[in-house]
């Protein structure tokens, strides 16, 4: 049930409230007439409320909050709402199969972004950004443009030419792209949108394998660098003719995750050690070190002409099973990253709870968890361990004031 409002207005219209009411209605898929009927007012009066020309009374706000499935706290936030993701995703969703399944995800992603901004506002924090200028690749060869941009971006971020180990943390902390991992339909790898004042936002499918998630992250980051104002939904499909933008993004992912110079050096070193006889097990270990799939690694080596074309197809036809080989080689199988929220988002929520600036119920809503698990997250983020005088490991609480 929505929170009870203390006082929604001081007799003056609130522009941010009016804008949030309109955005919530649109996200709920309701017409102005339907909302007016539920409120028991005329449509022109609802229009006046949404324009901020007429103040919203407390009892009206309660009705609209219930109708739109929002809390009073969401609707009464003093900041204007985030740019509507649904509007930006309209073209991308129109081209995607089963768009209806994705609309709910888009709406929830927008609410997560708005919650992120609210947490930052309450904490007095600034969400970091270190964005490069957009690179226009119009008219350029997609593969060459992708390699050039990937090389430039790795240099900008000081990555050298080795594997990128913690890609999500890199984008979140060093670049300031907000990365979420929601549950998506199996045929959807991820999505990208740019909306102020949040900035670049990427969603990756929490149910996909770890290597696929990293590829999707790099793919969407390529879109962010080259076409920031065009939202993208990446659907796994067989194209008759792959669009240039998708060829660019996939090529960017390959070059960013497996840069030419570093991979050349590692492969030639491996080849020398094996007297030129590189095995499937060697390739699997190489893929593991770069945290990509065996298929992605072999196709990249084919692209660099370090392996003959068709090597992956031949290996597959021979019945080679990467998962079984990983077990035999003792290579750990990385679990998918199913952490819905960015680290900074969770830290802000925990900090505000510890400082008693949000309630336990609000904490749970921000973290999308029940109260027990929300408190557990706070314990994990604000607690550590130390060694006591008797040599025993004891908890070290950094948040003794937490309720």
Please identify what each model-predicted range represents.
Residues 1-403:
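Short juxta-domain linker segments that transition from a proline/glycine-rich
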């Amino acid at each position: 049930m929505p929170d009870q409002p203390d006082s929604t207005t001081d007799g003056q219209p609130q522009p941010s409230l009016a804008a949030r009411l309109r955005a919530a209605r649109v996200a709920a898929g309701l017409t102005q007439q339907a909302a007016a009927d539920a409120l028991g007012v005329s449509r022109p009066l609802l229009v006046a409320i949404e324009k901020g020309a007429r103040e919203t009374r407390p009892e009206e706000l309660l009705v609209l909050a219930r109708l739109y499935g929002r809390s009073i706290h969401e609707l009464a936030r003093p900041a204007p709402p985030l740019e509507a993701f649904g509007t930006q995703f309209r073209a991308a969703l129109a081209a995607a199969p089963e768009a209806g399944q994705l609309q709910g995800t888009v709406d929830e992603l927008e609410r997560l972004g708005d919650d992120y901004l609210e947490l930052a506002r309450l904490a007095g924090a600034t969400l970091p950004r270190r964005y490069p200028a957009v690179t226009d690749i119009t008219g350029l060869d997609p593969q060459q443009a992708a390699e050039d941009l990937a090389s430039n971006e790795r240099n900008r971020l000081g990555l050298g030419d080795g594997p990128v180990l913690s890609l999500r943390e890199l984008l979140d902390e060093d670049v300031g792209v907000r990365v979420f991992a929601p549950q998506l339909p199996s045929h959807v790898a991820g999505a990208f949108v740019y909306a102020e004042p949040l900035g670049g936002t990427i969603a990756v499918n929490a149910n996909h394998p770890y290597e696929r998630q990293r590829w999707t992250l790099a793919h969407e980051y390529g879109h962010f660098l080259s076409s920031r104002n065009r939202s993208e939904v990446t659907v796994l499909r067989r194209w008759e003719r792959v669009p240039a933008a998708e060829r660019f993004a996939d090529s960017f992912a390959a070059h960013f995750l497996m840069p030419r110079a570093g991979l050349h050096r590692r492969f030639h070193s491996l080849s020398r050690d094996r007297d030129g006889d590189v095995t499937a097990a060697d390739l699997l270990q190489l893929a593991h070190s770069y945290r990509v799939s065996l298929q992605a690694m072999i196709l990249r080596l084919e692209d660099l002409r370090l392996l003959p074309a068709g090597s992956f197809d031949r290996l597959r036809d021979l019945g080679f099973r990467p998962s079984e080989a990983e077990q035999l080689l003792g290579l750990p199988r990385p679990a998918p990253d199913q952490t819905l929220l960015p680290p900074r988002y969770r830290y802000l929520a925990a900090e505000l709870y510890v400082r008693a600036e949000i309630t336990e119920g609000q904490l749970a809503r921000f973290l999308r968890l029940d109260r027990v698990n929300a408190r557990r997250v706070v314990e994990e983020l604000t607690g550590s361990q130390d060694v006591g005088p008797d040599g025993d490991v004891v908890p070290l609480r950094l948040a003794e004031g937490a309720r």
